[in-house]
């Protein structure tokens, strides 16, 4: 029987490829994939993430290949993402794995969401695979384990993080969350933030503690991506690692005998 995977995405602006790449990988692998968002509305990509001419101003690199932008627009304009569950409606007992996808909007409507934390804690207790990419990893940081003095569920683990050196941060930043495909009923947020909301690298370093490791390699790239497995977690650094993230989740789910280890709730 095909494994069932729950994919979470933000309604306030995904980085298109960070949803598209794992989504396509999971479906291509033949898994039964269900999408959930905070509002139960189609997840829309940030407009800059589907602009093939966009050059990241921090790393001075064009991060959106034209063929990737075209595929994201195809998914956004079509029906595959049209009718997601809400986070509250989703029940972890119905799935074999939970996969969080990134984007700057995840810092607003995912990272401190009770419903996301409940799904993650239920997956953690059941020793199911938990995936996190880029800024969605903040949701792992803030999911706390009552059995471990309310430390993060990633305490003691090796977890990737979007590097501090890549953050949009500085005196004059005014970041908006303009979406591709926005409608009157699904237009995201008009909030302005002074760059990225939080430095994820710092959050992860604090959350994993001295016995864990924050993997935050500033030279990660499409040809040399950064993804990592430390059961039950599969994590990826940022957009350049989106394809590798999806592929690694498929690899782990297809080879649980190799990767799965006892968790704190089933020892």
Predicted regions and their residues:
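Glycine- and acidic-residue-rich phosphate-binding/metal-coordinating active-site segment common to enzymes
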Residues: 129-130
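Short, thiol/selenol-centered motifs that function as redox-active sites or metal-ligating centers
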Residues: 133-137
